[in-house]
């Protein structure tokens, strides 16, 4: 996972509240067995509307999504985060997030910043005035900025640290690799242990 300290790019206004994970990515796409290639499934039902932002050239390559309250609610599916990232989003700002979605985002390298509803309206107004507006989401300073506009956001310290360091669950575990190895070597031989993968298993 790549470290994130700052995200700068085109911002998209998603003027919807209560956007659940099924609206982010419908269930039929969950059968895929890879963690990439979900950009075509993002907001699949809504993108059938030619006026939806995904179909607007001005928002091509967008990296920041500004949504209404209660974004990412509903069932737990990491695919929702994968779809947003595969499309190109690196940060989402909203007054409230589904707890599980927010947790999944921090583990997958998607910055989720909590802003007030008034500040969301300010951001939307700026984006309406200048479609394709570039927005900078600064994780170090915890502020989103555009010319003449500065909006603070909240993010818990643990998730902020993981994003700044670029630590997914595997990388977080590997920070303690020496301690884990020492513990394994000190266990009795008859106890269950983690063994290196055999070459044949790696080939499969």
UniProtKB/Swiss-Prot annotation:
Coiled coil (residue ranges): none
SUPFAM superfamilies: LeuD/IlvD-like
Keywords recorded for this protein, A-Z: Amino-acid biosynthesis, Branched-chain amino acid biosynthesis, Leucine biosynthesis, Lyase
Pathway in which the depicted protein is active: Amino-acid biosynthesis; L-leucine biosynthesis; L-leucine from 3-methyl-2-oxobutanoate: step 2/4
InterPro entries: 3-IsopropMal_deHydase_ssu (IPR004431), Aconitase/3IPM_dehydase_swvl (IPR015928), AconitaseA/IPMdHydase_ssu_swvl (IPR000573), IPMI_Swivel (IPR033940), LeuD (IPR050075)
Catalytic activity: (2R,3S)-3-isopropylmalate = (2S)-2-isopropylmalate
Assembly with partners or alone: Heterodimer of LeuC and LeuD.
Function: Catalyzes the isomerization between 2-isopropylmalate and 3-isopropylmalate, via the formation of 2-isopropylmaleate.
Stated name of the protein: 3-isopropylmalate dehydratase small subunit
Naturally occurring in which organism (per UniProt): Clavibacter sepedonicus (Clavibacter michiganensis subsp. sepedonicus)
Gene encoding the protein: leuD
């Amino acid at each position: 996972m790549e470290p994130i300290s700052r995200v700068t790019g085109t911002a998209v206004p998603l003027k919807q509240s209560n956007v659940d994970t099924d609206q982010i990515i419908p269930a039929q796409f969950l059968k895929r067995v890879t963690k990439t290639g979900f950009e075509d499934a993002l907001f699949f039902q809504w993108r059938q509307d030619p006026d939806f932002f995904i179909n607007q050239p001005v928002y091509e390559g967008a990296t920041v999504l500004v949504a209404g309250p209660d974004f990412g609610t509903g069932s737990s599916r990491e695919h929702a985060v994968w779809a947003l990232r595969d499309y190109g989003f690196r940060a989402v700002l909203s007054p409230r997030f589904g707890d599980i979605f927010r947790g999944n985002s921090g583990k997958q390298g998607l910055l989720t910043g909590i802003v007030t509803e008034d500040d969301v309206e300010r951001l939307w107004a700026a984006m309406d005035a200048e479609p394709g507006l570039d927005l900078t989401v600064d994780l170090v300073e915890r502020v989103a900025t555009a010319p003449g506009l500065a909006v603070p956001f909240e993010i818990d310290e643990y998730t902020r640290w993981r994003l700044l360091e670029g630590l997914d669950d595997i990388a977080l575990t590997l920070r303690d690799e020496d301690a884990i190895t020492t513990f394994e070597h000190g266990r009795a031989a008859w106890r269950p242990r983690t063994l290196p993968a055999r070459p044949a298993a790696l080939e499969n």
